[in-house]
């Protein structure tokens, strides 16, 4: 835990107009921590976890809806929630080692949703599991349940759909970052007697859950992205204008 002096010095650097990334590099403090201090600089007394927005007398949406929409996409693609002891649950998001930027983005999203809980990176073969413990993950992700996601119904609660409608690109980005990819296809044509090679990018999204595929395509429809479904598990985006939209709002994994 950082003392108040350290917190205020980091915030003072950020208040000078510097980016959170530069402040993080200078101080060694994560961007998520600095961002959370802008909301509340004082550490919480006693209980590390602030009240869950869904458990209040009148349930409210998460304080960081854009981060929530992104994390929801990651969870539906490569996440799981497991019970620990004393009513605590562990959220785990599998992130490939090949994309360190995605791992950082996942850590930041988890930290923003539960800023007073520790976020860990657990190494495994070829990947890292971004994990965080809280009693409230099932409140925030009611899709949690026994069995595999593709073997049970997956539907958004009205409050979740409202967040996705407000932040559709974050939701799409989370889904593609978990179960999607951007690839470059190519073809050849004979032009003026010479064979020329043409390359064109496209996006794929793969998931065994028909419900999750429908959530993905429904959101693509909402943002004007054209798509096709070549088989029961894959969604393809190949139209030039639609690929350009995804490049603008999602982009290749990094």
Where are these regions (language model features)?
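Internal intein/HINT superfamily modules and their associated LAGLIDADG
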Residues: 1-254
């Amino acid at each position: 835990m950082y003392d108040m002096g350290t917190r205020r010095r980091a915030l003072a650097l950020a208040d000078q107009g510097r980016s959170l990334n530069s402040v993080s590099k200078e101080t060694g403090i994560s961007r998520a921590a600095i961002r959370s201090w802008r909301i509340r600089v004082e550490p919480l007394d006693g209980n590390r976890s602030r009240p869950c927005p869904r458990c209040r007398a009148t349930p409210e949406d998460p304080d960081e809806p854009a981060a929530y929409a992104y994390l929801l996409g990651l969870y539906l693609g490569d996440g799981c929630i497991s019970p620990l002891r004393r009513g605590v649950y562990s959220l785990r998001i599998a992130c490939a080692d090949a994309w360190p930027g995605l791992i950082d983005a996942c850590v930041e999203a988890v930290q923003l949703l539960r800023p007073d809980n520790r976020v860990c990176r657990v190494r495994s073969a070829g990947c890292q599991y971004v994990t965080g413990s809280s009693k409230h993950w099932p409140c925030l992700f009611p899709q949690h349940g026994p069995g595999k996601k593709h073997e049970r119904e997956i539907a958004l609660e009205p409050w979740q759909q409202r967040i996705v409608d407000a932040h559709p690109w974050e939701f799409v980005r989370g889904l593609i970052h978990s179960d999607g990819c951007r690839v470059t296809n190519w073809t050849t044509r004979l032009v003026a007697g010479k064979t020329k090679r043409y390359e064109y990018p496209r996006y794929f999204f793969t998931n065994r859950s028909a419900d999750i595929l429908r959530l993905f395509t429904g959101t693509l429809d909402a943002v004007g992205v054209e798509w096709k479904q070549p088989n029961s598990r894959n969604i393809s985006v190949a139209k030039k204008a639609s690929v350009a939209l995804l490049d603008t709002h999602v982009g290749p994994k990094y």
